[in-house]
Amino acid sequence: MRIGIVLVLAGWVFAGGEVAAQGKCDRACLEGIAEQYLDALVAKDPKKLSLASNVKYTENGQRLQLGDGFWNSVTGRGTYKLHVADQTAGQIVTFSTMREAGNPMIIALRLKIDGSRRLTEIETLVAHSEGGAKNLETIGQPRAAFLRATPPADRVSRAELVRVANMYFSGMQLNDGKGQYPFADDCDRLENGGKTTNAPGRGGAPKPDPKTASNYSAMWTCREQFESGLLHFVMRIRDRRYLVVDEERGLVVAFAFFDHDAGASRQFKTPDGRSVTAGPVVPWTWEIAELFKVEKGLLHEIEAILERAPYGMTSGWSSWEDGMSDKIQFAR
């Protein structure tokens, strides 16, 4: 890690405490604000919202006037919804299926409020994944672990929750199979509603051996994927913004970008020394919002919303230097 995690997170906790000092908005309050936003979005009426004079809105990394972009094309709400509230930082992230021109799709929405409960930051990741939205709506409800409180005796600090979540990104970036991967045995990951771990083989195909395969498999466990060393082509995971943390439930939401440079990172060696060529053949980037469930220092559940973006895309919230860095960033 290129920075002092403890120092950065200490500043982040202080920044979150500023909102709390002004007048805390609890879980129900934050969820109510998110619901109000989604209703105003479908009504195409930003005037229904309580907005700060300096409110900032981005959509897939682009700064827009509030009411533009997805506000023009949205036609309804879907049936899947997952709220993650950070009462300390005054922020909430919502994963939700929606309708755009009548078609199912997914959004990851981040809202930040001030001490008067006015919206100051609105960030939307719009994922045009009709199949993913249908998958989530077939699942119906968020996985129980995301809604379950961690026993008080097992709760840890915000800094510790972020530290464990960040090990996921650090372990995937230029993955070599030799890192420390804090996965629980029951770890599972959904990506735009689809299983990317522990998935059944298509047509009854057998599970490949992680120790001899040349491409990683969605049939493997979280740990098997990382220990295979076959994710090396994820050249960089940057602009890692850990903006919402729920200590009560052991949840962390990060926004980030996964870069595939299509260059030398495609040629690498597996942990046992085999030479492999894998990964995208043209440069491109995933823009991603990723939710982690952490218990007793291990990752149990992971859920991601992502959309393909131009290579090197930035979030619209970070400086150029921070947007290109893999350091931990925190709520301001």
Tell where the protein language model's regions lie, with residue ranges:
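Bacterial N-terminal signal peptides
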Residues: 4-15
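C-terminal and inter-domain tail/linker signature
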Residues: 20-332
